[in-house]
Amino acid sequence: MKNLKKLLGCVALVTFSMSLSAQEQVQGFVHQQSKATDYVWPTDQQVLDKLAKWQDQKFGVLFHWGLYSVPGIVESWSICSEDVDWISRKGNLPYDEYKKWYWGLKDSLNPVNFNPEQWAEVMQDAGIKYMIFTTKHHDGFCTFDSKYTDFSIANGPFKNNPRKDVAFHVFDVFRKKGFMMGCYFSKPDWHCEWFWNPYFATANRRINYKKENHPDWWKNYQTFTQNQLDELMTRYGSFDILWLDGGWVTGDDINLDGILEKARKQHPGLISVDRSIRGKNENYQTPERGIPETQLDYPWESCITLSNDWGWVPNAPFKSPQKVINILSEITAKGGCLLLGVGPTADGVIEEEVTKRLHEVGKWLRFNGKAIYNTRITPVYRDGNVWFTADKDGKTLYAIYALPEGEKLPEVIEWKGNLPKGNMKLLKGNKRVKYVLKGDKVEVTLPKGRAICPKGT
C-alpha cells in the first residue's frame, strides 16, 4: 500500500450487537448466509458486470409499505399460524375474524400525503446508492396496479388519486435520481386462493394443500405469479435487481428459470436474489438482522432495520447515526453491502426522526465516503478497534477507527499490520496526522478539537 488514509469517526463496534425484536430472539439470523461452496457464480457476463457495479454501491434501502403500515404492526406475519411463537396479535379476535380484519385494512390505506420525491431526497441525502421497494409482501397486497388481482392499493380509497399506482411512481422518482433499482416481490401470496386455498386450514407459511392432489391449483398459482412478474418487468421501467423473498417456500417451483430468462431479455444483466434458495438464481446472499463473522468471498448484503421492524410502527426505537455508520463500516470491511430497512408511514411519508438520523449518516459519508464506496476488502481487515478497506487498485488503504457508542475518542490509537509506508491523512480536510512505527505496530496521534462524530448519537 503506497498510502494510508486515516478515517476517524464513530464507526464499527468491535463486537457487533443490536437490540433484538421477537423474531431475532427466537431465530438469530433470519436468513443465514451459507458456505462459500454453496454459492454458484453466474455464468452470464452481463450479470457479473451488474454485480460488480452493485458491489460498489455499498449502501441501500429496503422499503416495506403495505396494509401493516395502517395500524403500525409487524408486516404480514400476524396472519400466519406458524409464527405465533414470536408474534402476538393485537386484541382478542379469533383467527378467522382477525384475518378478515387484516384483509379489510385495504379499505383504510389511503396515503394522501404520498411523496416519493421526499423519500428519494431523504435517501440521497443519507448517501444511499440503491433501493429495493416492496411491490408485494407475503400477505399478497400489491403496491402496484396489477391486472390480475383487485387486492392492491389501486383499488382502495386511493384509487382516484393520479398516483394510485404507487410502485410506478416510487420507481420512477428513484430511477431519475440515479439509484440502482430493485424490485422486491414475495413468492408466497397468502391472499391468493391458489396458495392458501380457503377449502383448507392454513397451518403454516406454505401452500395448504398437496400439489399432487391439486395440480391445477398449483399450475394456476404459477401462472398468476408469472403474470404479475411480467407486469413488473415490462410496465415499471428498468431494473437492476429482482429481490425475491419467501425462500422458506422450498420445493415449490414457480418456474423461476423461465421467469428470469424472459425478464433478462427486458433487463440485461438483471441480478436475481432468490433468497435462501442456494443455486444459480441467488446471485448474492442476504443474511438478515446480523453481520457474518468474517469476510465472505462471494457477493452478499446484510439486511438490517433502522428500527426493530421493517415496516412503520409508532414510537419506534431507532438506531443512532453512529450505530448505522458502525454497521456500514464493518460490513464494508468484510466485503458486503448494507441494505437498511425503512418503513414509510401509512399516509405516505418518511417520518421526521428517520430523516434526521439519516441526514447525519449522509453528512458523515460526504466527508468519509471514499473509505466506503467503490472499495475492496484487504487480507488484514481488522485489528482491535480498527477496520480496513482499500481502493480498487490497492494503492490506498483506509483505516476506520471503531469508536464504541458512549465512549470518548482517545488521543492516540494503534493497530498492528497494514503499516503505513507514506503519508497518513484524515479524509475530512485531507490533513496529515502524526504517527510512529513501533515494530509491527503503528501509533497515531489524533488532532485535537475535531468534530468527527455525527449528531444524535
Question: What do these predicted regions represent?
Answer:
Residues 23-457:
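Mature catalytic domains of secreted/periplasmic carbohydrate-active enzymes
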